[in-house]
């Protein structure tokens, strides 16, 4: 897919890999919607990169917030062609550390953001992509890229929640790719 003139959504786009991707997309002529919760960094990045970028404060686990941000992206830029799911957190805690069990709420929060948040965004973006006309003669409508980690396969001490979340991302990507292939939407990690 040529990036020039395409629109990308980048979750976690205000820093790290997400920010690097935002910059690369803009350098190659794409328009970008940053979905993040860091208003300061996201807003400054959008301002720095100009009219080709918008920032939306989005909690990826919030269905209504994601849907509203997708609508705003379509209103600003038209069809959505790319979605990079970078939003995520880590929680370094042993299953039992210093005689106490890891708080279940910490485990759930990592799963909620890294796994369920990724699924929430990709399913709503896929719905939007499926409603769009194909961009080429092969029927391609878009691509969704999920961010996993070697921790999905080789987690270390204190990475149970993070490893489980990234293992879930790896595990769901292939069946989702098969689900969406007939709609012209590619899904990769």
Which residue stretches match the model-derived regions?
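Canonical Rossmann dinucleotide-binding motif of NAD(H)/NADP(H)-dependent dehydrogenases/reductases
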Residues: 3-32
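Conserved Rossmann-fold SDR core element
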Residues: 25, 79-82, 170, 180-189
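The beta1-alpha1 cofactor-binding region of Rossmann-like NAD(H)/NADP(H)-dependent oxidoreductases
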Residues: 39-40, 57-69, 104
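Catalytic Tyr-X3-Lys loop
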Residues: 81, 89, 100-120, 145, ...
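Conserved mid-core segment of classical short-chain dehydrogenase/reductases
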Residues: 90-108, 127, 131-138, 158-161
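Active-site helix of classical SDR
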Residues: 122, 165, 173
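Alpha-helical segment proximal to the catalytic Tyr-Lys
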Residues: 127, 178-179
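Residue(s) in the substrate-gating loop at a strand-loop-helix junction
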Residues: 149
């Amino acid at each position: 897919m040529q990036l020039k003139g395409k629109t990308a959504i980048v979750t976690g786009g205000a820093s790290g890999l997400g920010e690097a991707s935002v910059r690369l997309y803009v350098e190659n002529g794409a328009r970008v919607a940053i979905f993040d919760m860091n208003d300061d960094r996201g807003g400054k990045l959008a301002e720095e990169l100009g009219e080709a970028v918008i920032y939306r404060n989005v909690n990826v686990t919030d269905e209504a917030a994601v849907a509203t941000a997708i609508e705003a992206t379509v209103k600003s830029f038209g069809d959505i062609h790319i979605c990079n799911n970078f939003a995520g957190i880590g929680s370094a805690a042993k299953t039992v550390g210093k005689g106490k069990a890891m708080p279940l709420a910490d485990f759930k929060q990592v799963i909620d953001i890294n796994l369920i948040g990724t699924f929430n965004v990709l399913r709503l973006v896929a719905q939007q992509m499926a409603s769009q006309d194909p961009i080429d003669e092969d029927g391609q409508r878009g691509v969704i890229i999920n961010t996993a980690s070697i921790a999905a396969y080789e987690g270390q001490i204190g990475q149970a929640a993070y490893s489980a979340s990234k293992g879930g991302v790896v595990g769901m990507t292939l069946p989702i790719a098969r689900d969406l292939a007939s709609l012209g939407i590619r899904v990769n990690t």
